[in-house]
Every structure is written in C-alpha cells, then in structure tokens.
C-alpha cells in the first residue's frame, strides 16, 4: 500500500524465503500452490535431543501429518527421530495444507538430524505415502518453471512430475520412494 493506492508485489515468494548467506541445516524450499499460483516457501526443521517425552511441534504444517511423516521416515528410510524433539516451521506463517509438502518437510528433518545443509538452490515437492512411495503433485510443470524462474537449480520431484523436456537452468532428479530421495540428497 502506498499513498497512491495498492501496489503489486513483484515476487511474493520472497516473503516466504529466508535470506541466509549460506545454506543451513534443516532448511528446504518447497514449491506449493496458493490457489492456482506456484509459491516458493521455506520449510525449516529443528531436531534436538528430547527428554522423557519428545515433543512434535509444527507451525504451518498439520501436526498429525508431521507425526505420520516421522513414522514413514523411520520405517522406510531408517531415520529414527522417535526419541528427539522435532520442530517444523513454514516461514512467513503460511499454512500449507496440500500433501505435496511432505517430501520437503522430510528432507528438512533429515538435514537437521544430520546437521548437513541441502545444496544451495535446492527445491523439493511431492506427497509421501505410508508405504514410502513419492506421489505426484498437481501442476508439477508450473512448479518447476516457477523455481527455475526464481534461480533455483536443483529439484527433487516425484517421477510422475518429471518433465519430458528439460527445464532451462534446473537439474531435476525424479524419485519414486522416500529412501531414494534421502540417498540422493546425501550424495549431493
């Protein structure tokens, strides 16, 4: 809002992305949909030693969904956080209700647990099922184009969302299972 009225926001995704100089552990950028518009949102996770009763807190992500993702990580990727406090935050207070956030949340959690940041320019999206499968997200091509437009260079996406032709400036890694995605990011 200016003295002359409303002014458009050139890059709404900038509101939901942190301005870290270097990548930090526990951070993963997600391409979500707000209505029909792709929007980049940073997901932050902090995994810390818990007491006798570990806590699971989330802001912007449903708490029950977080508990389910932690169980899938343990069962299918061998990442145990059952005795740890786990905190997850969607930057900027945005509420993410679509399941396409699952993959980014899980990669942020494993990054925090290992204390190793994901590469600079990294994005991820995809639903993760209880059997560990990575399911496609709606409008995947639009999500990838938006990420490339904003300068992101590495994407981990469901195999069904992999484009038939390359997206300029974006290296796309298509995965079918959560353990495959975890192994991939560990090798980057």
PLM regions with names:
Residues 1-188:
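Peripheral, non-AAA+ core regions of ATP-driven protein-machinery
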């Amino acid at each position: 809002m200016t003295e002359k009225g409303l002014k458009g926001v050139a890059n709404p995704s900038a509101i939901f992305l942190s301005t870290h100089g270097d990548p930090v552990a526990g951070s993963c950028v997600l391409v979500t949909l707000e209505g029909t518009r792709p929007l980049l949102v940073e997901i932050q996770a902090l995994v810390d030693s818990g007491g006798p009763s570990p806590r699971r807190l989330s802001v912007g992500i449903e708490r029950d969904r977080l508990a389910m993702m932690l169980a899938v990580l343990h069962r299918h990727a061998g990442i145990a956080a059952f005795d740890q406090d786990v905190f997850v935050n969607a930057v900027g207070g945005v509420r993410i209700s679509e399941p396409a956030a699952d993959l980014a949340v899980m990669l942020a959690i494993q990054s925090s647990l290992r204390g190793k940041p994901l590469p600079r320019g990294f994005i991820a999206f995809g639903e993760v099922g209880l059997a560990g499968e990575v399911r496609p997200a709606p409008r995947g091509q639009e999500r990838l184009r938006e990420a490339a437009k904003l300068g992101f260079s590495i994407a981990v996406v469901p195999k069904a969302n992999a484009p038939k032709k390359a997206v300029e400036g974006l290296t796309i890694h298509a995965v079918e299972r959560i353990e495959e995605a975890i192994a991939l990011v560990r090798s980057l």
